[in-house]
Amino acid sequence: MAGLATVSKLAGETVGQEFLIFTLGNEEYGIDILKVQEIRGYDQVTRIANTPDFIKGVTNLRGVIVPIIDLRVKFAQQGVSYDENTVVIVLNFGQRVVGIVVDGVSDVLSLTAEQIRPAPEFAVTLATEYLTGLGALGERMLILVDIEKLLSSEEMALVDNVAKSH
């Protein structure tokens, strides 16, 4: 069994995990590339009454109603604007399709286990239970987000209801 653990550890070190890197304000975030379905420009959405501000509304994506969540609003960023760089990352996870609005997408990076540090005990813009960890790549520090934990089950129930009502 010890040999298997060593092989798994070595495989993790050489292969790494790929993250889509996106920006919110001045910070760089990473999300598991396997959860990303597509990246689109930001289009107007159909606003839904009585939903939190961070749920921008829904859009029709090839016949699928996709709730759109603005992470900038969810993370309480000031001065949120929509311009030509604003994009929607369409995610597919846990039998759900959800779009998240971000300031921009930069690249896809592969991080090895050694490059991923545990999340600190505190964070200013979001609670640490939403973090997978911090990715250290040279001078770059990437905040790695667990999107399923970020969108709590209560919020996902709300998102599901929004999608089903349209």
UniProtKB/Swiss-Prot annotation:
**All copies of domain CheW-like, residue ranges:** 16-156
One Gene Ontology term, aspect cellular component: cytosol
Per the UniProt entry, what is one GO biological process? signal transduction
Q: Does the keyword Cytoplasm apply?
A: yes
Q: Which UniProt keywords apply?
A: Chemotaxis, Cytoplasm
Q: Give the matching Pfam families.
A: CheW (PF01584)
As for subcellular location, the record says: Cytoplasm
- InterPro entries listed in its UniProt record: CheW, CheW-like_dom_sf, CheW-lke_dom
Query: Which cysteines does the record link by disulfide bonds?
Result: none
Main location (coarse class)? cytoplasm
Where are its TM segments located?
Answer: none
SMART domains attached here? CheW (SM00260)
Function in brief:
Involved in the transmission of sensory signals from the chemoreceptors to the flagellar motors.
UniProt name for this protein: Chemotaxis protein CheW
The gene for this chain is cheW
